[in-house]
Curated annotation (Swiss-Prot):
InterPro entries: MraZ (IPR003444), MraZ_C (IPR035644), MraZ_dom (IPR020603), MraZ_N (IPR035642), MraZ_sf (IPR038619), SpoVT-AbrB_dom (IPR007159), SpoVT-AbrB_sf (IPR037914). This is Transcriptional regulator MraZ. Belongs to the MraZ family. GO terms for molecular function: DNA-binding transcription factor activity; transcription cis-regulatory region binding.
Length: 150
């Protein structure tokens, strides 16, 4: 099937120390095709988790941007500066740093959503609200996607 991607959804529970078990199918993608670690950063109401090799592509592209543009500096402060490398413990869990847990309002029930080269980490209730909005806008989303050739 070619290059492996993160696909599907999985619901997990964050433990009291802020550790999150990563689904086996996501771990297998990492172990078989990437370094077995994650770089996690914030994006709006969720967190994004990247294999280090995919994250490196983002950093390389970001280095090409002009340092004087306010939008670039804001991107670097918001997205790049919040990135944390997280390694797995021997039970397949990562420790999400407190400031990132707070940013995404991660308390207990967490949904992981595979989106190809990375996956999103959501508070389950926040995810449910976003999916409802997406369903309400489904026709517009499909028209947009048709315009992209998909």
């Amino acid at each position: 099937m070619g290059k492996p991607y993160f696909r599907g959804q999985s619901i997990h529970r964050l433990d009291a120390k802020g550790r999150l078990r990563i689904p086996t199918k996501f771990r297998e993608v990492l172990q078989n095709h990437y370094t077995d670690a994650l770089v996690i950063t914030r994006m709006g109401e969720c967190l994004l988790a990247y294999p280090p090799e995919e994250w490196e592509k983002i950093e390389n592209k970001a280095r090409e941007f002009s340092q004087v543009q306010p939008e670039h500096r804001a991107f670097m402060r918001y997205f790049i500066s919040s990135a944390e490398e997280c390694e797995f413990d021997n039970q397949g869990r990562i420790l999400i740093p407190p400031f990132l847990r707070e940013e995404a309002n991660l308390t207990q029930d967490v949904l992981l959503a595979g989106v190809l080269t990375n996956f999103e980490i959501w508070n389950k209730s926040t995810w449910d609200a976003h999916i409802k909005l997406d369903k309400d806008s489904y026709q517009k989303i499909m028209e947009f996607m048709a315009g992209t050739g998909l």
